[in-house]
Amino acid sequence: MEFSSQLSELTGIKPIYPDIGLHGGGWHMHGKDGNLSVHMDYSIHPKLKLQRKLNLIVYLEEDYSPEWGGSLQLWSHNYETNKPLKKEKEIFPLFNRAILFDTTQKSWHGFPEKINPPDGKLRKSFGVYYLTDVTSTAEERYKAHYERI
């Protein structure tokens, strides 16, 4: 069974398509003082015109230490201000850990504090995104929306 079919069965999302062009995906590497502001990803793929639905992130730095920072933060949404409301969860970038989450219209995430790994160490991950047909409730956001926390 193809991986996309397994994801569809696991999540109930039908149809589901891999973003084979890796728009916004691929390798993500951050060294000393690197960070990623809390943001919502694009909701509509700018070329394929499909709705972004799932993020799959795999962490690839061996021996990454918690003291260096860089845990992925998942935030709730403030519907009055359309901004992040509260940090709900932190996920440490443990080597070979995979995170799969629904890229909803309000799924704020990032690691806003600067990281502090020693020279030669990076926070490495690989991101792959999955798309579906556009729903009637999808906001048309063709690029990520960032907020400073």
Q: What kind of feature is each model-predicted range?
A:
Residues 1-23:
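Signature of the catalytic double-stranded beta-helix
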Residues 28, 33-37, 41-53, 61-149:
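Catalytic core of Fe(II)/2-oxoglutarate
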